[in-house]
Swiss-Prot record:
Belongs to the universal ribosomal protein uL2 family. GO terms for cellular component: large ribosomal subunit. Residues 223-279 are annotated as: Disordered. Signal peptide: none annotated. This is Large ribosomal subunit protein uL2. One of the primary rRNA binding proteins. Required for association of the 30S and 50S subunits to form the 70S ribosome, for tRNA binding and peptide bond formation. It has been suggested to have peptidyltransferase activity; this is somewhat controversial. Makes several contacts with the 16S rRNA in the 70S ribosome. GO terms for biological process: cytoplasmic translation. SUPFAM superfamilies: Nucleic acid-binding proteins (SSF50249), Translation proteins SH3-like domain (SSF50104). Residues 270-279 have a biased composition (Basic residues).
């Protein structure tokens, strides 16, 4: 999918770019598979902000996606390729032979009229889902389960994928987009192919208003706040007090490891992800 740029007739259009959406075949979702979810705008039950920089987005319907793909040995025809405002990847409406409809994450290269299937005996073809133990090494997969039957949790965003790197007993070695190598049980399901909308990272928002449509509010630097609001606040002129950068609650940031040590899933990590030292 290509990127559309604009003539600089305004300050906003000078840097703005959008996807051309030429591959999209449907503009309205399939209503039986949609929900209306209330938007909390980053507030908890008490009405207080629990997540900053959220609020004021455009209304949207939630599309119910089948991340489990457990309807096995029944082929389905791809009916549409649709935009989903709730995620960066595109989605596809599929119709099974028995007449049931479902939304799935659209893999890159899938087209209307293609057939997809789930199950251990499925063909190694883009869009088919099967136990990861049945997929040959070197194959790119997305929507990968970490727990059997829970549904895909890894490689679900636009252009993301994992690569089958090998086998270790009943576990499959999966190389993730972050360069981490992780063990996944051979009976966990995965979908063949790369997640759609690979050009998503090339889109430039271009103006503040477009971020507001997405529900993103402005981020104020701590150094321009008062001492009561942020550890970096106060002082004459621009100064952060000479301390290492911290969050508003005093937790070190910018390089500080915040991942909890000794997590139960650590035993499945074969190789940790490489950290970007140039930040």
């Amino acid at each position: 999918m290509g990127i559309k740029k604009f003539k600089p007739v305004t300050s906003a259009s000078r840097y703005k770019s959008v996807l051309d959406f030429k591959e999209i075949t449907e503009t309205e979702p399939y209503k039986p598979l949609t929900l209306t979810l209330s938007y909390k705008a980053g507030r908890g039950d008490g009405g207080k902000i629990s997540v900053r920089h959220k609020g004021g987005r455009v209304k949207r319907k939630y599309r119910i996606i089948d991340f489990k793909r457990r309807k096995t040995n029944v082929s389905a025809v791809v009916k549409t390729l649709e935009y989903d405002p709730n995620r960066s990847a595109f989605i596809s409406l599929i119709c099974y032979k028995d007449g049931e409809y479902a939304y799935i994450l659209a893999p890159d290269g899938i087209k209307v009229g293609d057939t997809v299937q789930s199950g251990a005996g499925s063909e190694i073809k883009i869009g088919n889902a099967m136990p990861i133990g049945k997929i040959p090494p070197g194959t790119n997969v997305h929507n990968v389960e970490l727990q059997i039957g829970r549904g895909g949790q890894i490689a679900r965003t636009a252009g993301s994928f994992g690569t089958i790197a090998g086998r270790d007993g009943e576990y499959i070695l999966l190389k993730l987009p972050s360069t981490e190598v992780r063990k996944v049980h051979e009976n966990c399901y995965a979908t063949i192919g790369i997640c759609s909308n690979k050009d998503h990272n090339l889109v430039s928002i271009g103006k503040a208003g477009r971020s507001r449509w997405l529900g993103k509010r402005p981020t104020v630097r701590g150094v321009v706040m008062n001492p009561v609001d942020h550890p970096h606040g106060g002082g004459e002129g621009r100064t952060s007090g000479g301390r290492h950068p911290v969050s508003p609650w005093g937790q070190p940031t910018k390089g500080y490891k915040t991942r909890r040590s000794a997590r139960p899933s650590d035993k499945f990590i074969v190789q940790k992800r490489k950290r970007n030292r140039n930040r």
